Design a protein with these regions (language model features):
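Generic detection of short hydrophobic beta-strand segments and adjacent strand-loop junctions
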Residues: 52, 62-64, 98-100
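Glycine-centered coil/turn sites that cap beta-strands in beta-rich domains
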Residues: 1-15, 19-39, 49, 61-73
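Extracellular Ig-like/FN3 beta-sandwich strand-entry sites
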Residues: 32, 57-59, 82-84
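C-terminal tail/sorting-segment detector
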Residues: 78, 82-104
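Solvent-exposed serine/threonine-rich low-complexity stretches and specific carbohydrate-binding patches
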Residues: 47-56
Length: 104
């Protein structure tokens, strides 16, 4: 999704928020660099690494969760519970965190 080339890095609020099953995270990359988007629980544990790759300048979207089994209704450690989660964009010298809410 490379519509217009942005002149700065930016992390948008996810949509929808709150979400039930999936949500979309949109972000802008100002120049070619390594991009990482990580989702954490409120205890700082990594839930999922959405992106960890070099990207050209542009505007992108990524869905959370990406792992097919992450929302299964079982007792595994991978099951997401209702509540707040943080997601972080790291690109170049830019870092930004946002909060999202899961309400099943």
């Amino acid at each position: 999704m490379n519509d217009l080339v942005p002149n700065e890095f930016y992390l948008f609020q996810n949509f929808p928020n709150p979400f039930k099953e999936k949500t979309t995270i949109k972000y802008c990359v100002a120049y070619k660099t390594r991009v990482r988007i990580t989702v954490f629980n409120t205890e700082g544990e990594i839930i999922e690494m959405l992106i960890d790759e070099e990207k050209e300048a542009g505007t992108y979207k990524s869905e959370f969760p990406q792992a097919a089994n992450i929302l299964l209704e079982d007792k595994s450690d991978k099951q997401l519970k209702n509540g707040n989660y943080l997601y972080r964009l790291e690109a170049g010298n830019y870092t930004s965190d946002k909060q999202m809410i899961l309400e099943k």
